[in-house]
């Protein structure tokens, strides 16, 4: 049996402890062998990043240099068109084969918006969803048919993620750090300290490049 791999996408503008620490805990909780970090190029749902693709990639390389759990996948950065998760996960499934257990990590806030994603209903054909729970967000979807979809796929045991290739949603009890890239950018713009919010080598690079000023 192949070991469970997970993909973790985002803008990472910049990468910070709120990205890394919950996923490291998640890996220990459910037995992830590898987490692939995939930075977006042109996120369809969000404003354009302040840092360039090359700068965001380099910050990620710095952040995971001493963390063997993580690997970096640059495919979305190399696209000139918007990145759609459903397309990316379909391509990943084709690369890994039909039997490999694959998962996509999202936050609870993203789960609530999930039905608005491009071809969202095809994503569970190719991967599981692992949802990192966050305080203050409801556990129910806003529409009845979406709640039914959630309950249909929900599992309470991580074993299902290992034994099945795709199709399950698991709500993980991960620590939540009150850190966001927006907060970091605002603090840097004001000249405030961010020492405890992101890795030191990433912060040094931000200062060297004069980012988020």
Swiss-Prot record:
Stretch forming the signal peptide: none
Which GO BP terms, alphabetically?
A: NAD biosynthetic process
Coiled-coil residue spans: none
Named in its record, the pathway it takes part in is:
Cofactor biosynthesis; NAD(+) biosynthesis; deamido-NAD(+) from nicotinate D-ribonucleotide: step 1/1
The Gene Ontology terms for molecular function here are: ATP binding; nicotinamide-nucleotide adenylyltransferase activity; nicotinate-nucleotide adenylyltransferase activity
Q: Which reaction does it catalyse?
A: nicotinate beta-D-ribonucleotide + ATP + H(+) = deamido-NAD(+) + diphosphate
Quote the EC number. 2.7.7.18
Entry-linked SUPFAM superfamilies: Nucleotidylyl transferase (SSF52374)
InterPro entries per the record?
Answer: Cyt_trans-like (IPR004821), NadD/NMNAT (IPR005248), Rossmann-like_a/b/a_fold (IPR014729)
UniProt keyword annotations, A-Z: ATP-binding, NAD, Nucleotide-binding, Nucleotidyltransferase, Pyridine nucleotide biosynthesis, Transferase
Family (UniProt):
Belongs to the NadD family.
Functional note: Catalyzes the reversible adenylation of nicotinate mononucleotide (NaMN) to nicotinic acid adenine dinucleotide (NaAD).
HAMAP family per record: NaMN_adenylyltr (MF_00244)
The name this protein goes by in its record: Nicotinate-nucleotide adenylyltransferase
- Please name the source species: Salmonella typhimurium (strain LT2 / SGSC1412 / ATCC 700720)
Which gene underlies this protein?
Answer: nadD
